Amino acid sequence: MIFNKLEEVEDRFREVEGLLSDPQVVSQQKRFLELTREHAELSSVVAVYREYKRVSEDIEGNRELLQDSDPEMREMAKAELPELEAHREELAQQLKVLLLPKDPNDDKNVILEIRAGTGGDEAALFAGDLFRMYSRFAEGQGWKVETMSVSDSEAGGFKEIIAMISGNRVYSQLKYESGTHRVQRVPETEAQGRIHTSACTVAVLPEAEDVDVDIDPTDLRIDVYRASGAGGQHVNKTESAVRITHVPTGVVVSCQDEKSQHKNKAKAMKVLKSRILDQVMADQQAQMAADRKSQVGSGDRSQRIRTYNFPQGRCTDHRIGLTLYRLEGIMQGNLSELVEPLTLHYQSEAMAAQEA
């Protein structure tokens, strides 16, 4: 079954290669770009499949040599076979992953929302730590981070911070970060040295494009008001802050970071569209979960997904039972140590669901 699919992919790859060299196609910019993207997606599958076929031919050749009259040739073939068979098995696993249904949001930018939860000032400080962690990870990936909305805490950190992270395949790397993040550490103000537990919630929403969400302007209520600082005092004499309410869903977004009302409105609309898209996706996922047990990347935000224990230098991801004693590096943005095992875990779940 899988090999029939792979043959179809290779046939389509050859067809697309031919089309990309057709002058008529080259002259149609939109069509040419679509085919270029498809060619890039197919090429990764085809490269592994062709390597799989080459290794399979080598295995067959070595098996034939086992019957050779020359004892040295037989011994050489026998010695090479285990390594070739192991390599072929690795390639087969890669192909299974490559043929999994693609998440249509993987290539998208994200809206990152971090909110302080239980724990008061400590939770707000941890929200700041999490934002720095994600910002440094983004910097390492060559992504751009743009703050959309900030609610500062007087003790430092954030009550809430919303940012846009844009770049190559951002959602694919950050989609498993949605959930409740718990921190255990001794606050600087704690004289007795007792460990306090605080929590923040993280939401990672794929950036909504106009084609994803159709919002009727008559469904929006837009309020303008004067921006205020951390202590509640007004910091702007003009009504530049914007609050947008989507009446049918009750989704409310406020933005006051920019001095221009127009810019605040544009930022608020981006967040609003992404939140509504997230609601639509959540409804769809709930429907899918009723049909199949495994729900990949559902990002259930009521779930405690990770604990950061500072006294022990430990970070534990509860979804996959992974514990790393490299907390300092993780907080500095070395998130790949968590992202890669999570991705592999959910890919394995998806493969098991396909084979069931």
Curated annotation (Swiss-Prot):
Specify the domain of life of the species encoding this protein.
Answer: Bacteria
- Where does the UniProt entry say this protein principally localizes? cytoplasm
What are the entry keywords? Cytoplasm, Methylation, Protein biosynthesis
Q: Where is the signal peptide?
A: none
Q: Which PROSITE patterns match?
A: RF_PROK_I
The record's listing under InterPro entries reads: PCRF, Pep_chain_release_fac_I, Pep_chain_release_fac_I_sf, Prokaryotic/Mito_RF, RF-1
Gene Ontology MF term list: translation release factor activity, codon specific
Annotated disulfide bonds: none
Q: Which residues carry this modification: N5-methylglutamine?
A: 233
Family to which the UniProt record says this protein belongs: Belongs to the prokaryotic/mitochondrial release factor family.
Q: What is the purpose of this protein?
A: Peptide chain release factor 1 directs the termination of translation in response to the peptide chain termination codons UAG and UAA.
Q: This protein is called what?
A: Peptide chain release factor 1
Name of the gene: prfA
